[in-house]
């Protein structure tokens, strides 16, 4: 038996302060009290079992709050592992994952202290022997009966890639924050008998994870008391498939919560009464180490929404509630400031002499994740029932977005001179960039602010027409850290655009020809925020995160998009690329293209007839250079790629403005040219034909027009806006396939079709799908480390006893810190719910995530996956940027 941790003396006042701070944060972060209505669309428990088990049962819920920490010794973590399930597949390469025992010994010093504190400070009352410092569900917490024959669980662990977790116990003579939490937890267990909702009771039920820098390790070893995780409802079983057997697919299974004697690792709160409230928007906070707020997502989005509604009311002469909105804004800002203060206080409690870091706090479905990047603190509050590693990845992107606006060296210098520096003033006007990123992370529809300004409106009877501009594929780029180029089926068009964007050679520079910009880094052509083509220097690669942050900055800034409304507008902006040069700045040249103006289809005051037109904010050329004085050179080069139409062409197009509504569309340029050739008017030259049109255009312009015709073709139009994915799963003819995401590991690019209904139209279904994708991705990349005896590839089924797991992972010094390698990761993983099945399949060349019909059999799933990979391989040149240009 492992020895219980030593009990340290505590201060009652310090316990009260810590309890009050945590209680305020949990109360402020919870959207509303939840009812006990069961909703089967949320996952609850992930189970290790064979393929034949595919039962989905309702789960009981609980509002119990659990306590865990990452400072246990490796021996304690190993000794707490319980018996694993005996059922394994014949194709498994390792034994089933053992279940960790999280209940502490009843003879721990914390229990004795709790009893002493209860006798001294709490009035006498009825007690329950079953209530102790444990995360077992209480009988009164369940809203529905549970089935003990079907109630099991599996360890679902947190990622350790960003912040290495602690190994070993830190013992100090001073008051330790973890000891404080243990003592408060023990006392609250005794107080729970009287059903009192005190501050100490709330803190005792918090699930806290922390990491200590004193014992940091690069290994992926985890504490068994904190790495377990319950999935959202309706999911089915997992086991590892043999690397050589593609048909051996793992499967997860949904079970009820455990009865008395079974170990429930994490309780889930009751489902909300309305299905729409299942996935409320995550709340993201960025604050300084001094506690000053820098960015608060829900407050910024609310202000943005109020401004949009105010503009609408002003146009409709209905601005009668301005005072009410201002009061709501003040109350929201005050509440957000209070929450930021509580977060800063909680982080400070754990920032003791050992430099411990608070990682996350869990209460049922509510998860509060922390990311400390001095001098900034980033916090995310979510109730999507997902993994902390997913939220930490989101917070990392927000931090990198800050670094892209203010370099890391400048950030350190500012806060080094003034620790209470207000960074929000320096970042004023960039809220739209963060809002655009948060909307993608939350899978929300993106509002077209240009339409609110009257640039993209259809005034028919005074009713505004809202264009669908949301690209759901942008959500996949973040959790897979890969770019998704636009699919182009026109032969050689991508290569032609790449050749047209080749920078001029340095020797060719003259008075009539442009020079090559100094320190040229990247040249990009983007459509709707998606990469069309890319050029880079030879022997130099570009990180996809840098390009994602760059395109997010361009598409998310209202000022940049407003400036790009004119063909003559050119934007020159400094930025930092965190993965390329985080301590310095580069400069980006942005020019939005307006192909409609090249063929003369625009006129002042004209309406946007036809939905197939590309607007000026959808197509852009971006040039990144390290020379801050290169703007004139870059401007001259890009301007030489876009020729202006002749004067007589502009005059004649105004006379033909009253032709058919589709005459001004790019895809009808051929018809327009033929019609113009037959229309001869006295005193005026004929409108140029297609040959004359091509005579004054550059090669770049002609290729751009071909691209626009392709993107605005009737088969590529979705809900009134160009569809950048350009294909659906229905076009592939694979029965049962609803959606997929394919990541090519060689090119670090991905492809995915457009979301079908109900995922595209219903936010609940869409967010559930993305949550399942992230959970499968986490389980594949961060499984429980296998024992040394099962790390070798084997096709036979073996069942090792718990002692084998102890001796293999923690028993020998050589394997005291087991590492996860590509051989020990899961190859396939299946999650099944009432609505869909999600399959994750990882190999060396690719990663594939499928959304399939829940009634599909395992053999049909394997057939769909194999057929899909063959189709992607045959269309690789259309889906990916295979031959990136270089100079």
UniProtKB/Swiss-Prot annotation:
GO terms for biological process: autophagy; protein targeting to vacuole; vesicle-mediated transport. Residues 71-80, 784-803 have a biased composition (Low complexity). Residues 254-265 have a biased composition (Basic and acidic residues). It comes from the Eukaryota. It is a peripheral membrane protein. Keywords: Autophagy, Endosome, Membrane, Protein transport, Transport, Vacuole. Residues 301-315 have a biased composition (Basic residues). It is found in: Endosome, Multivesicular body membrane; Prevacuolar compartment membrane; Vacuole membrane. Residues 67-150, 191-280, 298-338, 784-806 are annotated as: Disordered. InterPro entries: FUZ/MON1/HPS1_longin_1, FUZ/MON1/HPS1_longin_2, FUZ/MON1/HPS1_longin_3, Mon1. Residues 81-95 have a biased composition (Polar residues). Its main location: membrane. In complex with CCZ1, is required for multiple vacuole delivery pathways including the cytoplasm to vacuole transport (Cvt), autophagy, pexophagy and endocytosis. The MON1-CCZ1 complex acts at the fusion of vesicles with the vacuole, through its regulation of the SNARE complex during the coordinated priming and docking stages of fusion, and particularly at the stage of tethering/docking. Belongs to the MON1/SAND family. This is Vacuolar fusion protein MON1. It comes from Mycosarcoma maydis.
């Amino acid at each position: 038996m492992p020895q219980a941790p030593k009990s340290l003396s505590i201060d009652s006042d310090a316990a009260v302060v810590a309890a009050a701070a945590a209680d305020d944060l949990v109360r402020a972060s919870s959207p509303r009290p939840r009812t006990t209505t069961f909703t089967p669309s949320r996952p609850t428990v992930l189970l290790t079992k064979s393929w034949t088990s595919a039962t989905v049962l309702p789960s009981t819920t609980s509002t119990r709050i659990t306590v865990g920490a990452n400072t246990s010794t490796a021996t304690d973590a190993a000794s707490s592992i319980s018996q694993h399930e005996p059922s394994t597949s014949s194709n498994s390469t390792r034994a089933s994952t053992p279940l960790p025992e999280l209940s502490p010994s009843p003879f721990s010093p914390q229990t004795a202290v709790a009893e002493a504190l209860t006798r001294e400070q709490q009035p006498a009352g009825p007690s329950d022997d079953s209530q102790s410092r444990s995360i077992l569900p209480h009988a009164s917490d369940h809203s529905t009966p549970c089935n003990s024959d079907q109630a099991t669980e599996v360890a679902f662990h947190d990622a350790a890639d960003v912040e290495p977790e602690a190994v070993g116990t830190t013992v100090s003579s001073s008051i330790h924050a973890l000891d404080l939490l243990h003592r408060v937890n023990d006392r609250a267990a005794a107080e729970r008998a009287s059903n009192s909702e005190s501050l100490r009771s709330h803190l005792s039920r918090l699930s806290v994870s922390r990491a200590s820098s004193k014992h940091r390790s690069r290994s992926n070893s985890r504490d068994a008391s904190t790495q377990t995780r319950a999935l959202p409802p309706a999911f089915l079983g997992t086991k590892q498939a043999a690397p050589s057997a593609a048909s051996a697919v793992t499967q997860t299974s949904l079970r009820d919560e455990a009865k008395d004697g079974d170990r429930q690792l994490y309780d889930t709160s009751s489902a909300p009464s309305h299905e729409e409230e299942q996935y409320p928007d995550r709340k993201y906070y960025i604050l300084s180490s001094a506690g000053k707020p820098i960015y608060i997502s829900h407050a910024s989005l609310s202000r943005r929404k109020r401004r949009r509604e105010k503009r609408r009311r002003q146009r409709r002469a209905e601005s009668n509630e301005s005072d009410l909105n201002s009061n709501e804004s003040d109350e929201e800002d005050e509440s957000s400031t209070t929450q930021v203060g509580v977060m800063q206080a909680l982080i400070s409690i754990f920032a003791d002499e050992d430099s411990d870091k608070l990682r996350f706090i869990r209460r049922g479905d509510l998860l509060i994740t922390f990311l400390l990047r001095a001098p900034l603190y980033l916090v995310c509050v979510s109730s999507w029932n997902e993994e902390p590693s997913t939220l930490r990845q989101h917070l990392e992107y927000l931090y990198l977005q800050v670094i892209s606006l203010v370099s890391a060296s400048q950030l350190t210098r500012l806060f080094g001179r003034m620790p209470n520096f207000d960074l929000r003033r320096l970042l004023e006007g960039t809220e739209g960039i963060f809002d655009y990123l948060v909307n993608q992370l939350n899978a929300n529809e993106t509002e077209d602010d240009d339409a609110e300004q009257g640039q993209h409106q259809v005034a028919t009877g005074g009713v505004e027409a809202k264009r669908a501009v949301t690209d759901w594929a942008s959500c996949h780029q973040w959790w897979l850290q890969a770019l998704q180029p636009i699919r182009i089926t026109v032969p050689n068009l991508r290569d032609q655009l790449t050749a047209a964007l080749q920078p001029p050679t340095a020797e060719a520079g003259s008075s009539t020809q442009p020079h090559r910009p100094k320190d040229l880094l990247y040249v990009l052509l983007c459509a709707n925020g998606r990469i069309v083509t890319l050029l880079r220097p030879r022997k130099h690669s570009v990180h996809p995160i840098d390009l994602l942050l760059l395109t997010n900055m361009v598409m998310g800034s209202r000022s940049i998009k407003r400036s790009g409304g004119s063909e003559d507008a050119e934007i020159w902006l400094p930025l930092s690329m965190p993965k390329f040069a985080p301590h310095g700045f580069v400069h980006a040249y942005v020019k939005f293209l307006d192909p409609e103006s090249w063929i003369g289809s625009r006129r002042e005051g004209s309406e946007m007839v036809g939905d197939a037109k590309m607007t000026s904010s959808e197509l852009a050329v971006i040039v990144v250079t390290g020379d801050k004085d290169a703007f004139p050179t870059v401007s001259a080069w890009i301007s030489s790629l876009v020729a202006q139409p002749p004067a007589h062409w502009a005059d004649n197009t105004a006379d033909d403005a009253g032709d058919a509504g589709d005459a001004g569309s790019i895809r009808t340029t051929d018809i327009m040219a033929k019609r113009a050739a037959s229309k001869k008017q006295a005193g005026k030259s004929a409108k140029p034909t297609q040959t004359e049109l091509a005579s004054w255009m550059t090669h770049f312009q002609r290729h751009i027009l071909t691209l626009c015709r392709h993107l605005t073709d009737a088969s590529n139009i979705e809900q009134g806006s160009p569809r950048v994915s350009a294909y659906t799963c229905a076009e592939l003819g694979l029965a049962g396939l609803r959606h997929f995401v394919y990541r090519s590991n060689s090119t670090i690019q991905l492809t995915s079709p457009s979301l079908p209904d109900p995922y595209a139209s219903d936010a609940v279904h869409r967010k559930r799908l993305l949550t399942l994708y992230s959970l499968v991705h986490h389980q594949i990349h961060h499984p429980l480390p296998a024992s040394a005896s099962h790390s070798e590839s084997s096709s036979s089924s073996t069942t090792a006893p718990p002692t084998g797991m102890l001796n293999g992972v923690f028993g020998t010094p050589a394997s005291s810190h087991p590492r996860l390698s590509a051989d020990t990761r899961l190859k396939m993983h299946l999650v099944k719910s009432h609505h869909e099945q999600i399959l994750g399949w990882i190999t060396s060349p690719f990663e594939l995530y499928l959304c399939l019909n829940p009634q599909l059999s395992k053999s049909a799933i394997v057939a769909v996956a194999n057929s899909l990979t063959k189709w992607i391989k045959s269309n690789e040149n259309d889906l990916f940027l295979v031959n990136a240009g270089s100079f």
